[in-house]
Amino acid sequence: MAEDRFPGWHGTTILAVRRGGEVVVAGDGQVSLGQTVIKGTARKVRRLSPGGHEVVAGFAGSTADAFTLLERLEKKLEAASGQLARACVELAKDWRMDKYLRNLEAMLIVTDGETLLVITGAGDVLEPEHDVTAIGSGGNFALAAARGLMATDLPAEEVARKAMAIAADICVYTNGNLTVERISK
């Protein structure tokens, strides 16, 4: 993703876990340039409230591109009266049709506490099969760990924190400085 345009930039692991009537979204704080950590406390998980409809979003890829997408998502949510899936599909349509948006290099995980979706860099909207999804440089590590931890009785936040710790131990572009947001319907 962002690595295509800026070969040396790396960073971000975002994980979402749905369990027990809530969704927890966790993101690490590391941004790296090559072998150098530029920032260890970046905040890549945000709470949005367009029109009073609460949504939590985590992003990976280009930060400027992600903020552009988050702004557009907020507008789509207002227009869709808070219907997250509809707003995301409309955003994806724009992403695919608009010349400017097609060049954006970011991915999003979004949830309203019930619906959990990934919006890919290609403009696809995906719903995870196993109540767990992840994006970013350490996403596969976090996803594998979280799927294994879902076999336990741990609450969603603990699954997310433990899985992110495992990802941070494996992925050099992921740290243990987490931002965690919880949302339920």
Curated annotation (Swiss-Prot):
Activity control, per UniProt: Allosterically activated by HslU binding.
Binding locations of Na(+): A168, C171, T174
Keywords annotated in UniProt: Allosteric enzyme, Cytoplasm, Hydrolase, Metal-binding, Protease, Sodium, Threonine protease
Membrane-spanning residues: none
Iron-sulfur among keywords: no
Residues of the active site: T12
Subcellular location: Cytoplasm
Pfam families: Proteasome
CDD domains: protease_HslV
EC number: 3.4.25.2
Catalysis: reaction(s): ATP-dependent cleavage of peptide bonds with broad specificity
GO biological process: proteolysis involved in protein catabolic process
GO cellular component term, pick one: proteasome core complex
InterPro entries referenced in this protein's UniProt entry, alphabetically: ATP-dep_Prtase_HsIV_su (IPR022281), Ntn_hydrolases_N (IPR029055), Proteasome_sua/b (IPR001353), Proteasome_suB-type (IPR023333)
GO terms assigned for molecular function: metal ion binding; threonine-type endopeptidase activity
PANTHER family for the chain: ATP-DEPENDENT PROTEASE SUBUNIT HSLV, METALLOPROTEASE TLDD
Primary role: Protease subunit of a proteasome-like degradation complex believed to be a general protein degrading machinery.
Subunit and partners: A double ring-shaped homohexamer of HslV is capped on each side by a ring-shaped HslU homohexamer. The assembly of the HslU/HslV complex is dependent on binding of ATP.
Family designation: Belongs to the peptidase T1B family. HslV subfamily.
Protein name (record): ATP-dependent protease subunit HslV
Gene: hslV
